[in-house]
């Protein structure tokens, strides 16, 4: 077992007890998160408008806070993109995931906070890996790196805007390079073909044991890797 695998499995094992507690107490876990979200929401304009400070139950929340579609919530998003602080989240939000509009012609901008990236994506990936490691202790997937094929992002004023995958890659550079390939600079190249060529040059000598990203994108990349190396399989 490699040093990388030993360290990762030790990191995962610390999380197993928490995951087991979530399994055994799902309602309590959700109630605790509900209270946390209320505490955070009270510090915002949104919280003032809907009087989150005095909400004590899910039923009360449902009766006081209306249901939003994107167009209804859009004014909040626009003000956050203008740099206004504590609109719907405490402090300033400077990351925005851009989605292709499915209900209108224009793209939608989804506010993304560092707290959200950490709790939902970074720890979420850790939890998936923790469960996998516990169920398949003999797997060698952690012996190498995960090749992550994401989208791209760019600066729009003071904000960083782009695919959620690119925002996640961009904001987790300080630790993830140890078990993820390619380098961040390569991973967020805007042009797909250029990115794939750079990945071929950079990663064919790496020990890749897992792939992450859109399956069709990965399939196209794998085909190019086979052409690049002259191999018949990976």
Residue spans for each PLM region:
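Nucleotide 5′-phosphate-binding alpha/beta core
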Residues: 1-98, 104-234
């Amino acid at each position: 077992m490699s040093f990388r695998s030993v360290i990762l499995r030790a990191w995962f094992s610390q999380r197993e007890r928490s995951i087991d507690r979530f399994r055994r107490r799902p309602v309590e876990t959700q109630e605790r998160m509900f209270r946390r979200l209320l505490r955070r929401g009270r510090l915002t304009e949104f919280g003032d408008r809907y009087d989150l400070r005095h909400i004590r139950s899910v039923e009360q929340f449902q009766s006081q806070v209306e249901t939003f579609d994107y167009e209804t919530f859009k004014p909040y998003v626009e003000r956050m993109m203008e740099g206004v602080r504590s609109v719907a989240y405490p402090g300033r939000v400077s990351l925005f995931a851009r989605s292709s509009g499915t209900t209108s012609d224009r793209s939608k901008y989804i506010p993304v906070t560092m707290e959200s990236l950490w709790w939902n994506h970074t720890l979420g990936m850790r939890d998936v890996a923790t469960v996998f490691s516990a169920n398949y202790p003999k797997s060698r997937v952690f012996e190498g790196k995960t090749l992550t094929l994401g989208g791209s992002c760019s600066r729009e004023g003071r904000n960083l805007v782009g695919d959620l995958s690119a925002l996640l890659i961009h904001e987790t550079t300080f630790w993830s390079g140890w078990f993820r390939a390619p380098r961040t600079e390569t991973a967020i190249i805007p042009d797909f073909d250029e990115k794939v060529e750079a990945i071929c040059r950079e990663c064919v000598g790496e020990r890749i044991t897992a792939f992450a990203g859109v399956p069709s994108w990965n399939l196209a990349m794998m085909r190019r890797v086979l052409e690049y190396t002259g191999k018949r399989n990976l």
